[in-house]
């Protein structure tokens, strides 16, 4: 598991530095362009995130062992696929570095050997990896598995959107491009669902529990985040002189506050039950910081999408115009 965390941390740092470089040095603005090469780094990151959570379940409960192994194979395979897409020149992108066919063939052969060999070993040895027990009731284990399914679904969405133009070109179906509308259509509801189950998993126990018991612990955070989100959105609309209610901003605030409040509730529960040692644990601190970081990311993406205004104008030197009431 430490190796998974190290790999995930370096991949996260690489994506963050790449985004910072593109934003400040190139002046592109925005937060994500769904470029094929950007997607090539996002896919292993999503799978590695799922792998971190599934490995914690395997470590603590001894379950979903085969699933964890499959995620390990998928994470490394998608890393190799990303290298192939960037270095072979099969995809058109401003981030692509090479168009050498020989290098592309070598990377494709290496990808086939590693992926094929891993799946071959798994097919013949996977049956020996037995789980200790199955999930019983509404536990944190079950919720982490659900989040795993959502992360894998997001990876498949990105994979289809990235490779479909390539497959279409190979089959002579014409050159097409898959843009942000496709990814936004699938990613927005999936991310909201991910935030919901993330908050519920933070408030659930590893031991057997039921849905009603978990709901009792999250009912107060749920009421607070709903009331606070509605108030904040109305306040933003009034002070920005824009009286059109933004549902996307409301959903963003609800998701973000839900994550923060359920984390606070989890910390409060541990303090109340005198589990201070767990709070000081590096694993718990890392989880808390990572979830807070994801909440901030959702906040930035959601609000920039809800309140941004773009217009294409023809202007002459010295002329001015008004956008959203500002000159």
Regions found by a protein language model. Name each.
Residues 1-88, 92-111:
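Hydrophobic, small-residue-rich alpha-helical packing segments that form membrane-like cores
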């Amino acid at each position: 598991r430490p190796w998974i965390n190290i790999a995930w941390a370096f991949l996260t740092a690489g994506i963050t530095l790449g985004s910072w470089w593109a934003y400040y040095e190139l002046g592109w603005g925005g937060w994500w362009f769904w470029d094929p090469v950007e997607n090539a780094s996002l896919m292993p990151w999503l799978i590695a995130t799922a792998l971190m959570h599934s490995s914690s379940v395997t470590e603590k409960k001894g379950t979903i062992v085969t699933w964890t192994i499959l995620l390990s194979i998928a994470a490394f395979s998608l890393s190799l696929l990303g290298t192939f897409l960037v270095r072979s020149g099969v995809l058109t992108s401003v981030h692509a570095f090479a168009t050498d066919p020989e290098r592309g063939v070598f990377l494709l052969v290496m990808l086939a050997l590693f992926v094929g060999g891993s799946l071959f070993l798994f097919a013949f040895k996977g049956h020996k990896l037995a789980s200790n027990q199955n999930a019983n009731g509404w536990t944190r284990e079950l919720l982490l598995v659900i989040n795993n399914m959502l992360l894998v679904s997001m990876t498949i969405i990105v994979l289809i959107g990235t490779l479909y133009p390539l497959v279409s070109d190979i089959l002579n179906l014409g050159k097409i491009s898959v843009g942000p509308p496709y990814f936004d259509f699938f990613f927005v509801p999936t991310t909201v669902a991910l935030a919901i189950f993330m908050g519920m998993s933070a408030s659930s126990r590893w031991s057997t529990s039921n849905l009603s018991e978990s709901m009792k612990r999250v009912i107060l955070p749920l009421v607070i985040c709903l009331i606070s989100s509605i108030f904040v959105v109305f306040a933003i609309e009034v002070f920005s002189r824009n009286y059109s209610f933004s549902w996307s901003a409301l959903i963003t605030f609800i998701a973000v506050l839900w994550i923060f409040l359920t984390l606070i509730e989890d910390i409060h529960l541990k303090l109340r039950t005198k589990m201070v040692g767990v709070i000081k644990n590096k694993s718990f601190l890392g989880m808390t910081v990572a979830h807070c970081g994801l909440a901030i990311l959702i906040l930035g993406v959601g609000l920039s999408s809800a309140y941004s205004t773009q217009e294409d104008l023809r202007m002459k030197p010295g002329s001015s115009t008004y956008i959203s009431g500002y000159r």
